[in-house]
């Protein structure tokens, strides 16, 4: 550290602040220090640093599933931002199971993470109250638990449903089906956004156009295809389909093409996620982008602020707007 300070004509205190991830160092100075560290292959003594500071310089992240592309994007945004501040990321998966999540929370706390970020599968208020008593910075990611106040970073699921349905209606669709996801709060909120868009654009709600889909898994594609085949078999009239996920939407499109329907001429389709290689499909898929990378970046910056001496207003609510990426499956000149 002394050599780096001398080489850059900076004080050892400034170098130390960069290593600790403090925010009162200019971006230019931080970049110079990190570049010189790289050139010298400098590795700080983590154990000594942790003992001095009482910090592990590790942030914990618990997600419902590591198989979900959205959470991979969130983790990427976190890692990129935390790395520049000298922090690492410890990731755990709850596998969409509340008991597994409780185990992972205990594991992360036993590792003395400095802050905990969690996209929780829990519905118990007691669980969240126990978390709050740990006196560690806590940020909820993507999923906002009811009846519990905490910092939150994510996209409003209701907005996701609204944006997708509104796009199809603006394209001219009047009989818009909705393929629901699992019975979760997020799925219910997307459904409420779908209903709100129908109402705002004076489109009649038809219960027969709402199709339940069992829990998300590697079988999502099959569930989407099966649901579409059933709608066609029952001769349900529809001209647009909004899907809870991209995988469901891909299944819908393939089932429609089997019956020689034109997508988007006969049937417009929109998914949610924009994380699969949907632009390379037979019919490139329109999808609502959940901005996972930005969610991760914003959550990391909030965590660092909470860990610094900076004053942060209680229970920050960072609701990021979703955006729709329009491709061939719902191509429209209206947007």
Question: Model-flagged regions — what are they?
Answer:
Residues 1-57, 334-335:
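N-terminal helix-turn-helix DNA-binding module of bacterial transcription factors
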Residues 7, 12-17, 52-67, 167, ...:
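Short beta-strand segments enriched in small/hydrophobic residues
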Residues 46, 64-73, 91-100, 153-163, ...:
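Hinge/beta->alpha junction and helix N-cap segments in small-molecule ligand-binding domains
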Residues 54-166, 170, 233, 237:
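Alpha-helical recognition/docking segments in bacterial nutrient-uptake
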Residues 84-85, 134, 198-205, 233-236, ...:
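Short helix-capping segments at alpha-helix termini
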Residues 175, 205-209, 263-268:
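Short acidic capping loops at alpha-helix termini that bridge into adjacent secondary structure
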Residues 229-335:
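Flexible loop/turn connectors
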